């Protein structure tokens, strides 16, 4: 595989990984909602603690702001669930270009739709990890040879580049000591 095909394969793998990324984002939102709900339901202070009475001027909107935050997060979760469903359809559309009963398709479905780790895939098939990987790479190559998939890759190259640059930027921000060689 030459450099151009490697880049196209990377874009294709990124496209196939969209369910995982959407599910990961939804999980983050779910965890945030749980954390805010726990804060809302947590007891205040210790034994015998009584908060001072608040003024009724309407400026103390603590409980209301928590409810608004929760409502906003619930709306984001609903939107993210829709994104997960759309991602599943997009990935299934791509995988439809592989032969119906092929091992390549089964491996790709286990990896990208069911989001199984390689260990589970190799046990499910059953094949060694290296054989599963060879079949997976063969599937990627088969997909790269389809005209419609090639057009989809071209349509997604810019989004992939943006995602990749954003990921690299976050990595650089995380470890400034690595940049300076310290």
Q: Where do the protein language model's features map onto the residues?
A:
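N-terminal interaction/assembly modules
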Residues: 1-97, 141, 145-182
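Short helix-coil-helix linker/hinge
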Residues: 97-105
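Short alpha-helical segment immediately N-terminal to, or the first helix within
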Residues: 110-111
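DNA-recognition helix of helix-turn-helix
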Residues: 126-149
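Helix-turn-helix DNA-binding module
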Residues: 114-131
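Short, contiguous, well-ordered secondary-structure segments
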Residues: 77-81, 120-121, 133
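Short, solvent-exposed positions on alpha-helices
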Residues: 105-106, 130
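N-terminal positioning helix adjacent to the helix-turn-helix/winged-helix DNA-binding module
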Residues: 87-90, 103-104, 135
């Amino acid at each position: 595989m030459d450099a151009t095909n490697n880049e196209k394969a990377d874009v294709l793998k990124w496209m196939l990984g969209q369910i995982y990324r959407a599910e990961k984002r939804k999980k983050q939102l779910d965890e945030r909602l749980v954390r805010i709900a726990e804060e809302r339901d947590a007891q205040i202070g210790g034994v015998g603690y009584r908060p001072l009475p608040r003024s009724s001027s309407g400026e103390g909107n603590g409980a209301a702001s928590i409810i608004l935050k929760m409502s906003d997060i619930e709306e984001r979760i609903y939107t993210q669930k829709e994104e997960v469903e759309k991602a599943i359809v997009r990935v299934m559309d791509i995988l439809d270009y592989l032969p119906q009963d092929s091992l390549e398709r089964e491996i790709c479905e286990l990896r990208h739709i069911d989001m199984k780790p390689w260990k589970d895939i190799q046990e499910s098939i059953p094949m060694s990890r290296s054989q599963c990987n060879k079949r997976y790479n063969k599937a990627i190559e088969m997909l790269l040879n389809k005209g419609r998939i090639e057009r989809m890759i071209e349509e997604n190259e810019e989004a992939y580049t943006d995602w990749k640059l954003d990921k690299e930027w976050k990595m650089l921000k995380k470890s400034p000591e690595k940049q300076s060689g310290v």
